[in-house]
Amino acid sequence: MANRQQPTSMPIHKYRPYEQVDIADRTWPDNRVTVAPRWLSTDLRDGNQALIDPMSPARKREMFDLLVKMGYKEIEVGFPASGQTDFDFVRSIIEDETAIPDDVTISVLTQAREDLIERTVESLVGAKRATVHLYNATAPVFRRVVFRGSKDQIKQIAVDGTRLVVEYAEKLLDERTTFGYQYSPEIFTDTELDFALEVCEAVMDVWQPGPDREIILNLPATVERSTPSTHADRFEWMSRNLSRREYVCLSVHPHNDRGTAVAAAELALMAGADRIEGCLFGQGERTGNVDLVTLGMNLFSQGVDPQIDFSNIDEVRRTAEYCNQMEVHARHPYVGDLVYTSFSGSHQDAIKKGFDAMEADAAAKGVTVDDIEWAVPYLPIDPKDVGRSYEAVIRVNSQSGKGGIAYVLKNDHKLDLPRRMQIEFSKIIQTKTDAEGGEVTPKDIWAVFQDEYLPNPRNPWGRIQVKTGQTTTDKDGVDTLTVEASVDGVDTVLTGSGNGPISAFFDALQSVGIDVRLLDYTEHTMSEGASAQAASYIECAIDGQVLWGIGIDANTTRASLKAVVSAVNRAAR
């Protein structure tokens, strides 16, 4: 088919394609991520600096406590040399002996100036586990425009900064602190690979990584500039060419300028990265840092333990929204208000059938649904695993069909409607949504269902109200039913005979001019135990109409008679 799109007048001449990596024998596409990486949350640093209203100390502490509770073991807590607020916060969590668990490492950021480095290391005095994170920009545009320096001069900034970190750590910190070092060639995505490698090697020459002396080399996509696959190529190239690789923790720090930060991080792991830096829900400068929640839940959905607890994802969201003063989008993966919700009729039908199949499979194996592999269409994970209920899984509007409506009735009211009754009732709901528009809530669905099918003692409707009924069976097996009822407002006694109570009731109705023919009948219990109620569903042909009725009662015979009354009264409505 021909492409009928037309060229635009947009100034594409201002931009050039991103340079590809010459790595013909790349191996990362064949790799799989089978264990969680090391995670670092930079919500309190990179995330906080991007807020319109940066966090107060109280909000910072609440965010820190949340990250610890979730299981993050590396947390970047600020830029203490940038101002007194960040410095005081770092000191406050160090001096509070209950704040930082023994297995949590705090990290602080600094530029490569001596006064800033000294102040940064000073903020860490008394910390149990701490890392200084030093960075300087290495990309050509920064060398030319910002620093106006040569490659050697830029490299020397990194070398001198690393040397100063070592000197001040030895001078200011004591044996109480397990000290680590991280270096980032900022704007790695726009830095020549051979130069990025050269700078990292020079930094390692100063730090001297070895057994029990790891170095973290963080390669940030400070601005996302390429496809995730090209980003992965760059990581594989660096991982292959770094010396002392066994003592290097190779870290990825994607931003989301092209909207592919999650994919970039995942492919970087396949290409050799050991660690990911990001923020909850993708907070951060411009389009944000990579989203740690999506990354962790992506692993979870593939059967890989993220080693971070997302079991109460709404609590995580509420805390993040409070601390950041920014809302999480309703469509945000795994956590948004609508991500486990289907409005489409075909989706809802598939979801309902998926739940039914899961229950049947579990019952056949003698286990619970939680013990078998999750397999429900349109739901990549079980919402219960992150603390969500099934209440919002199916919501009804004008695009919805029978499956969604039936799901609501079964899930909320234990009524498992027969398929043709589902179709009948969905048309009733469709009429309502077409007339009124918008969403129909589960409460609305139940109200319409009650009004359509079930008797209302406070506002009776229909020709017949049954008061009592009694069945006897003669020696030939013929049932005789005697019913005390109100017909068209007049109390009367109806009697009929037949093969079973329903047939006998049909015969009794003939005496008041109501001709009923049975088309289908089904019933089920609504719960377990001696006091369980039964739901009976009956499809009848009544005076040329085909209608369903429902009856609910602890006695199955009474339930079936109520179902007949429901259908008959609907026919006369």
From Swiss-Prot:
One Pfam family named in its UniProt record: LeuA_dimer
Domain Pyruvate carboxyltransferase positions: 37-314
Region entry Regulatory domain, spans: 456-573
GO molecular function: 2-isopropylmalate synthase activity; acetyl-CoA C-acetyltransferase activity; magnesium ion binding
Role this protein plays: Catalyzes the condensation of the acetyl group of acetyl-CoA with 3-methyl-2-oxobutanoate (2-ketoisovalerate) to form 3-carboxy-3-hydroxy-4-methylpentanoate (2-isopropylmalate).
GO cellular component terms listed in the entry, alphabetical order: cytoplasm
Cofactor(s) for this UniProt protein: Mg(2+)
Binding annotation for Mg(2+): 46, 253, 255, 289
Subunit and interaction comment: Homodimer.
Subcellular location: Cytoplasm
CDD domains: DRE_TIM_LeuA
E.C. numbers: 2.3.3.13
Keyword Disulfide bond listed: no
Reactions catalysed, as given in the entry: 3-methyl-2-oxobutanoate + acetyl-CoA + H2O = (2S)-2-isopropylmalate + CoA + H(+)
Name of the protein described by the UniProt record: 2-isopropylmalate synthase
Pathway of action: Amino-acid biosynthesis; L-leucine biosynthesis; L-leucine from 3-methyl-2-oxobutanoate: step 1/4
Uppermost EC category: transferase
GO biological process: L-leucine biosynthetic process
Source organism, top-level taxon: Bacteria
Family: Belongs to the alpha-IPM synthase/homocitrate synthase family. LeuA type 2 subfamily.
